[in-house]
Amino acid sequence: RRYERDIRKGKRFEILAMENSFHGRTLATVTATGQEKFKKGFDPLVPGFRHVPFDDRDALLKAVGDETCAILVEPIQGEGGVICPGDDYLPFLRSLCDERELLLVFDEVQVGIGRTGTLFAYEPFGVAPDIMTLAKGLAGGIPIGATVATERVAAAFTPGSHASTFGGNPLAAAAGLAALEVILEEGVLENCRRSGLHLRQGLERVALRHPDRVREVRGRGLIQAMDLTGPGTPVVETCMSEGLLINCTAETVLRFLPPLIVTTEEVDEMLEILDRALSSTCQGAG
């Protein structure tokens, strides 16, 4: 919005976000999130956000109006169930934003920094955002977040125009640089691709052994999901009892995000535990 006013000299303010999305826990990011369960108790929310179905070109074209200034999207909807759009969706968004003079904002907090096998999840699609948010793997466990932008968009933030208490602190910045150096120079991205493929193939084999329990396996790199025919919590609890930490999102979706340095041997161990958990929790599933 500041870019719209200070750089573009316009008055547009509306941000289009996606249904089923998740963007955070501040008032603005709760508003941007496309899941009602995260909004309860926080009314009144921030005005100027509207939601459209994810990976739906027609719905988005109809939604863009005279007050729209930006489109906010996760390249993969993580909290929403590891929902991957079609390969042409992100290029479509880039083309639409260029045509309508909108800013394209990618939330890569969960899928960025190597998670999908490339440094950023958008890279295989030949497009780039105007603004991107990053966190989680950015500093190897040290709390850090970053909002990065093109030079033209970043010009809207002049010194002192916006800040955060710990923004740019030396500890987090040093940790971020160290983590990026390891990721880029010590084969971490290659391992993400190798172990990610191994994980995907293994999950598909497990799914074939449990056709009554598994609807679908989906994901990219080291963010994978198994959509079950029934509640996922019993499987999560059984896996935990055997030392495997996974989680369940969207009630039926098991989500797998192992460390970026996970080995194929560790993936095999995980798959064995998962296989046993699906077998032992089959009674009453569905």
Predicted regions mapped to residue ranges:
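Conserved N-terminal phosphate-binding loop of PLP-dependent enzymes in the Aspartate aminotransferase
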Residues: 1-286
